[in-house]
């Protein structure tokens, strides 16, 4: 403990920026502060390394957020149809799921009769530790049930019908435990129940492999490279363009604040600007 310096504490918090919600980072900040305060009170350390560390909620700059124009989306999907990850990409564009929510999607979360998809867990591969980690959705509000579009329903039904011929690896015999954010109880993710399994390996595809594959597809489609989260941004943008109310979109995306929905995920496109001018023209008073 005596070797820990303020710079080490800051590094821990900064490393969480990309993968964790601001509330989770803040809770880590508080826990670290409490731990070192107790260590100092018990004479285990002479100086409190968190004294000079201040918590600042991470804010993503609008310029860092990428989304596809309608033309880019069409070109991308045409190329992606020939790839083994097409269903994953298409489903995010139809539902706005986060990558971890899509990877952790299990069949018990899909109701074909009611045509809904419930988000109640996530799954990601930790490369440094070399293991799969199940967890709760990003925030309390991220728990949600999403009505399926016709296309989303078709994608999931097609995967379900093909599943009996799916290759399976020993990894699928595992059951991962995690804490339910709403109740504090232990929940379980049965790996064999995952919707998306790589047909060649019989395992779920790792988070980073999706981005690597996306870059290749972007080159083929001759569009600017983007990462998986851009598909979620694109879903939000298309929804607003189609007239979905921001408050409704907030619920579909699982945001705690309407401000997050508007500031971070909704973009003004040239198409929507043209449409706004046409609407203004049609309502002009002569």
Report residues per predicted region.
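Basic, Lys/Arg- and aromatic-enriched nucleic-acid-binding interface segment
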Residues: 22, 26-28, 41-105, 112-113, ...
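Generic recognition of well-ordered alpha-helical segments
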Residues: 11, 30, 34, 150, ...
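Catalytic-site neighborhood detector that most strongly recognizes the C-terminal catalytic loop/helix
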Residues: 59, 67, 123, 234, ...
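Short, basic (Lys/Arg/His-rich) helix/loop patches that form interaction surfaces
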Residues: 19-22, 78-83, 95, 146, ...
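N-terminal core-binding DNA-recognition domain of tyrosine site-specific recombinases/integrases
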Residues: 1-44, 202-210, 224-230
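C-terminal secondary-structure termini that scaffold catalytic or DNA-interacting sites
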Residues: 114, 125-143, 147-152, 158, ...
């Amino acid at each position: 403990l005596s070797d820990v310096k303020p710079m080490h504490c800051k590094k821990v918090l900064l490393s969480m920026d990309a993968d964790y919600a601001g509330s989770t980072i803040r809770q880590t900040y508080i826990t670290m502060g409490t731990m070192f305060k107790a260590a100092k009170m018990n004479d285990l350390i002479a100086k409190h390394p968190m004294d000079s560390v201040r918590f600042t909620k991470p804010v993503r700059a609008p310029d860092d957020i990428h989304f596809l124009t309608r033309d880019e989306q069409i070109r991308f999907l045409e190329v992606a149809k020939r790839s083994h990850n097409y269903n994953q990409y298409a489903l995010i564009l139809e539902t706005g799921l986060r990558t971890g929510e899509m990877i952790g999607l299990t069949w018990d979360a899909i109701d074909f009769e009611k045509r809904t998809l419930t988000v109640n867990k996530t799954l990601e591969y930790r490369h440094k530790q070399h293991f799969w980690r199940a967890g709760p959705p990003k925030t309390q509000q991220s728990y949600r049930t999403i009505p399926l579009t016709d296309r989303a329903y078709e994608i999931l039904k097609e995967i379900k019908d093909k599943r009996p011929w799916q290759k399976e690896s020993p990894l699928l015999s595992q059951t991962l435990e995690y804490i339910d954010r709403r109740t504090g109880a232990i929940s379980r993710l049965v790996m064999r129940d995952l919707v998306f399994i790589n047909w060649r390996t019989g395992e779920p595809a790792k988070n980073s492999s999706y981005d690597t594959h996306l870059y290749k597809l972007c080159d083929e489609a001759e569009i600017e490279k983007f990462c998986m989260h851009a598909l979620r941004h694109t879903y939000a943008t298309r929804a607003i363009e189609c007239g979905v109310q921001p408050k409704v979109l907030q619920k579909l995306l699982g945001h705690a604040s309407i401000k997050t929905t508007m500031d971070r995920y909704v973009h003004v496109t040239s198409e929507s600007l043209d449409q706004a001018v046409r609407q203004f023209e049609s309502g002009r008073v002569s």
